[in-house]
C-alpha cells in the first residue's frame, strides 16, 4: 500500500481491501526507467480500462431489504440491556456475512431492532459471540481509533437522495464515532453530533442501545422511508464483517444507493430547530524569558438555526479553539510544504460539503479552512462568523463568512513569511459551495473562495466540477468519472490562471484501477486553498489486483493479496519533466490472523531547478537525479492488546543514500481504560553535501474512567527543532452536548550551547473551557 501523507481515519467499516487501500494503483510508464516500457505499459493500462468499460452491461440489482421502526410508547432506560417490553415487541432483522466470505454463515449472529418516538430514534443490538471474553476493546475516546475493536455501525439516508447521510458507530465499550457521508467511498468523521449509547456484557456476547435525538439530524419532514444500513465488525480471527444490505465484497458501507429501507419515520419531529451553545474560557499563558504569566478570560457562543428541516445556519461570536488538539509533528525531506489536517470543530463540521472534484486529496484543496485563524502556526482571533449547510430540494448548499481580528504575530512568523510588519490586519474571508443532483448518478457543482489570510492581496477562486458514479456497473461494480476546472483572479503571479483535471476510478475488491490527470497553471494561486505544486501537470495511473486465496488451498493462511502498481508523472504545463515515481508492491499480504507484511520497489526521478535544504546545512544542488528506494513493512493485527509495526525505507536518495526507520508500539489494557502508544522515526542520510540524522519521537497515553471522562497526553520531540512539547487534555462530557475541557500545553527547548544540552522551559499554557448546549 503506497503511503499517504495524511493520517488515515481508522474506522473498521469495509472489507479488507477497502479498509487497507489508501490509493488505487495503476502503472503507465516509467519515464526514465527510461521510457522503454512506457508504450507497453500504457497500452496494457488503457486496454484494461477499455475492457472494463466495454463490458459494462448492467444487471438487475437485488431488492433492497426493508424493516419497520416500531412506534415507541414508553420510556427507554439507556443501559445497553434491551430489557424493556418495547424491545421485545419490536420487529427485528439479522445481519449477513459481507467479508471475507459473503453470504456464508458465522457464529456471530447479530439481531437489530429499531424504535422511533416523536423526538428520537433508538437502535438495539444483540451481538452473539461464542467467545465473549475475546471481544476486542482498545479505545474509549470520542472519534478514537476503533480499527481493532468489535463495533456496530449505522448509516442513515435521511433525505432519501441515496448520496448524503449520517454515520454512527460504537465499540463494545460504548465509545462513539460519528460522521457525515457525502461520498460512497469515504466519510468525514469531523462532525460531532449529540447522541448517546450504552453497552452491556451478556452470557453469549454483548448488547448495545443507541439513541439519536431527532434534533441532531436534518431530514425531509414527513418522509416516511429513510435509507438504512447496519454493520457489525469482529476484530479477531482475521476480521469479519456482517452487514444488513448489500453484503458483497464490492460494496461500501457509505454507499447509500446500496442501503436498505427503514419505514415509519414520517412522524419524527425536529422541534423549533434552534440550538444555543454558549462557552466560557479561562487561559493562563507564559513565555519564559519573554513575558510574565498573563491571564485572560473570554466568552462566546454559537447559535444554530434550522431554516428548514434540511438547511442549517450557524452564527458564531468570539470563536474559541482552546480545546483543539495539537498537530502531530512531521519530518519533511521534500522541497514542498507538508499537509496538516484541520482539527478545529467549528470548521470541521460541514467540511465535507466543500469536497471538490474526485480523488484530489492533498494535491489540491480549493478551500482549506486551516488558512483561516492560523498564520504559520500563530493564532489569529475570529471576531465573528456565519455558516450555512444543507439542502434545498436537489441543491446542496454550503457558505462560510468569517471576520478575523487585527493581531500582532511573533517575530518568527514575520521572518518565515517575509511580512512587512508584525501586525496582521483583520480581514473578511469567504467560501461557498453549491452543487446540484441531476439524477441518482450525476452531481454538478461550483465553488468560490475569496480573501487573503494575510490581508495583503486580493484573491478569488472560482471553479466547477462534475462527478458521475454508479454501483451497478457490470452488475454490481463501482465506477466513478469526474472532471473539474477552476481559475484564480486578483493579485496572482503572471501566467496561466487556470486549473483543470479529470479522474476515472474503478474501486472494487478484486481489481481496483484509476487514472487521474490534473494541471495547475503558473498563475493559479488559491490563497484560501492548499496547492503544494503550482505550475505543474500531474498524471497518476494505477492498478491493483487483490485476490483472496482459497482457504482449502496451499495459501489458505493468507486472507488477501494486493499486487499494486502506480505511476506518477509531474511536468510543467509545457510537458517538461519535473519528477516521476513508479511504485510497485510485489508482496503485500494480509494473513488470516490479521497480521500483514509488505515489500515495495519505488524508483524515482527528480529534476531540481533550484537548490533546496533537505536538512539543516545540507543543500541538494540543481540537477537531474534518478534513484531507487525500497520499503519493507510489517504490522501485527489491531485486535491484540499489544500491537507492533515497523517500516523501513532504504536505498538511494538523490546523489546519496537514506535509511528511514519508523516503528510503533501500542498497548491497551483489557477493558480499554488505559492506552499507551510510542511512535518513532529515525532518518540516517549519507550525502556528498553532508551527512545528517533526524529523529522524531511521539508518545500518546490515555486513561478513560468511561467514554465520557477521558484524560489524554501527547508528548513530542524532534531533533530538528530541538523542542519537547506536551499536550495534556481532560474532557468530561457531562452529558452529550455539554463538555468541560482542561488543557495544559508546555514546551521545552534544548540549548545546544550548553555543555549538558539541557532542556529549558519555553512556553506554558493552561486553559479551561466549559460549553453548554440548549435546544429548543
Where are these regions (language model features)?
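Cationic, low-complexity basic patches in intrinsically disordered or flexible, solvent-exposed regions
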Residues: 3, 10
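Short hydrophobic alpha-helical segments enriched in small aliphatic residues
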Residues: 5, 15-17
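Bacterial N-terminal signal peptides
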Residues: 43-56
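Structural preference for beta-rich elements and adjacent junctions enriched in aromatics
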Residues: 59-437, 445-446, 456
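Extended, hydrophobic alpha-helical segments in both membrane/secreted and soluble proteins
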Residues: 278, 297-303, 311, 317, ...
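Exposed, low-structure sequence patches enriched in small/polar residues
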Residues: 381, 472, 476-479, 483-776
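Beta-propeller domains
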Residues: 406, 415-502, 519
Amino acid at each position: 500500500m503506497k503511503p499517504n501523507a495524511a493520517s488515515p481515519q481508522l474506522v473498521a467499516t469495509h472489507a479488507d481491501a477497502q479498509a487497507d487501500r489508501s490509493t488505487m494503483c495503476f502503472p503507465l510508464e516509467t519515464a526514465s526507467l527510461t521510457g522503454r516500457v512506457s508504450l507497453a505499459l500504457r497500452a496494457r493500462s488503457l486496454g484494461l480500462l477499455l475492457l472494463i468499460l466495454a463490458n459494462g452491461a448492467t444487471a438487475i440489482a437485488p431488492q433492497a431489504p426493508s424493516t419497520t421502526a416500531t412506534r415507541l410508547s414508553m420510556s427507554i432506560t439507556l443501559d445497553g440491556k434491551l430489557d424493556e417490553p418495547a424491545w421485545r415487541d419490536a420487529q427485528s432483522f439479522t445481519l449477513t456475512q459481507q467479508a471475507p466470505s459473503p453470504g456464508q454463515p458465522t457464529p456471530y449472529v447479530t439481531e437489530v431492532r429499531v424504535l422511533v418516538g416523536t423526538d428520537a430514534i433508538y437502535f438495539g443490538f444483540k451481538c452473539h459471540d461464542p467467545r465473549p471474553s475475546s471481544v476486542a476493546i482498545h479505545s474509549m475516546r470520542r472519534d478514537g481509533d476503533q480499527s481493532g475493536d468489535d463495533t456496530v455501525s449505522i448509516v442513515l439516508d435521511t433525505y432519501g437522495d441515496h448520496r448524503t447521510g449520517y454515520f454512527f458507530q460504537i465499540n463494545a465499550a460504548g465509545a462513539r464515532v460519528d460522521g457525515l457521508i457525502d461520498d460512497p467511498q469515504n466519510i468525514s468523521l469531523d462532525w460531532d453530533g449529540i447522541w448517546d449509547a450504552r453497552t452491556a456484557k451478556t452470557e453469549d456476547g454483548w448488547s448495545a442501545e443507541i439513541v439519536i435525538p431527532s434534533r441532531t439530524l436534518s431530514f425531509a419532514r414527513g418522509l416516511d422511508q429513510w435509507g438504512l444500513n447496519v454493520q457489525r465488525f469482529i476484530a479477531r480471527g482475521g476480521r469479519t464483517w456482517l452487514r444488513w444490505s448489500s453484503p458483497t465484497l464490492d460494496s461500501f458501507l457509505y454507499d447509500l444507493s446500496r442501503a436498505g429501507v427503514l419505514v415509519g419515520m414520517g412522524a419524527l419531529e425536529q422541534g423549533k430547530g434552534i440550538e444555543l451553545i454558549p462557552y466560557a474560557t479561562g487561559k493562563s499563558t507564559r513565555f519564559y524569558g519573554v513575558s510574565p504569566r498573563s491571564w485572560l478570560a473570554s466568552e462566546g457562543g454559537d447559535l444554530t438555526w434550522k431554516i428548514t428541516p434540511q438547511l442549517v445556519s450557524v452564527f458564531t461570536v468570539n470563536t474559541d479553539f482552546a480545546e483543539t488538539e495539537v498537530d502531530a509533528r512531521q519530518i519533511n525531506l521534500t522541497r514542498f510544504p507538508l499537509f496538516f489536517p484541520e482539527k478545529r470543530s467549528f470548521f470541521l463540521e460541514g467540511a465535507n460539503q466543500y469536497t471538490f472534484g474526485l480523488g484530489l486529496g492533498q494535491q489540491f484543496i480549493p478551500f482549506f479552512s486551516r488558512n483561516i485563524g492560523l498564520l504559520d502556526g500563530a493564532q489569529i482571533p475570529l471576531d465573528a462568523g456565519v455558516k450555512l449547510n444543507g439542502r434545498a430540494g436537489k441543491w446542496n448548499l454550503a457558505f462560510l463568512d468569517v471576520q478575523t481580528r487585527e493581531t500582532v504575530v511573533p517575530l518568527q512568523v514575520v521572518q518565515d513569511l517575509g511580512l512587512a510588519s508584525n501586525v496582521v490586519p483583520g480581514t473578511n474571508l469567504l467560501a461557498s459551495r453549491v452543487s446540484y443532483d441531476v439524477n441518482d448518478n450525476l452531481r454538478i457543482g461550483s465553488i468560490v473562495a475569496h480573501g487573503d489570510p494575510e490581508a495583503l492581496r486580493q484573491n478569488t477562486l472560482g471553479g466547477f466540477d462534475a462527478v458521475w458514479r454508479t454501483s451497478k456497473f457490470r452488475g454490481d461494480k463501482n465506477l466513478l468519472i469526474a472532471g473539474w476546472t477552476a481559475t484564480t483572479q486578483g493579485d496572482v503571479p503572471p501566467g496561466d490562471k487556470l486549473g483543470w483535471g479529470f479522474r476515472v476510478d474503478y474501486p472494487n475488491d478484486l481489481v481496483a484501477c484509476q487514472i487521474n490527470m490534473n494541471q495547475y497553471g503558473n498563475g493559479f494561486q488559491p490563497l484560501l486553498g492548499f496547492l503544494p505544486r503550482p505550475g505543474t501537470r500531474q498524471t497518476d495511473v494505477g492498478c491493483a489486483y487483490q485476490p483472496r486465496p482459497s482457504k482449502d488451498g496451499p495459501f489458505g493462511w493468507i486472507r488477501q493479496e494486493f499486487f499494486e502498481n502506480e505511476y506518477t508523472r509531474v511536468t510543467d504545463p509545457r510537458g517538461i519533466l519535473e519528477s516521476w515515481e513508479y511504485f510497485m508492491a510485489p508482496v503485500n499480504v494480509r494473513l488470516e490472523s490479521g497480521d500483514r507484511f509488505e515489500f515495495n520497489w519505488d524508483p524515482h526521478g527528480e529534476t531540481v531547478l533550484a537548490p533546496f535544504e533537505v536538512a539543516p546545512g545540507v543543500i541538494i544542488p540543481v540537477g537531474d537525479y534518478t534513484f531507487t528506494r525500497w520499503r519493507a513493512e510489517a504490522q501485527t493485527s489491531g485486535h491484540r492488546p499489544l500491537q507492533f509495526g515497523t517500516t523501513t525505507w532504504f536505498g538511494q536518495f538523490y546523489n546519496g543514500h537514506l535509511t528511514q526507520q519508523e516503528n510503533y508500539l501500542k498497548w491497551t489494557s483489557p477493558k480499554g481504560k488505559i492506552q499507551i502508544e510510542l511512535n518513532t522515526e529515525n532518518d540516517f542520510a549519507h550525502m556528498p553535501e553532508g551527512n545528517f540524522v533526524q529523529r522524531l519521537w511521539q508518545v500518546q497515553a490515555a486513561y478513560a474512567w468511561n467514554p465520557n471522562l477521558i484524560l489524554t497526553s501527547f508528548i513530542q520531540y524532534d531533533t530538528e527543532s530541538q523542542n519537547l512539547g506536551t499536550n495534556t487534555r481532560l474532557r468530561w462530557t457531562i452529558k452529550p452536548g455539554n463538555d468541560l475541557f482542561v488543557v495544559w500545553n508546555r514546551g521545552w527547548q534544548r540549548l545546544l550551547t550548553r555543555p549538558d544540552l539541557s532542556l529549558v522551559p519555553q512556553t506554558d499554557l493552561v486553559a479551561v473551557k466549559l460549553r453548554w448546549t440548549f435546544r429548543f
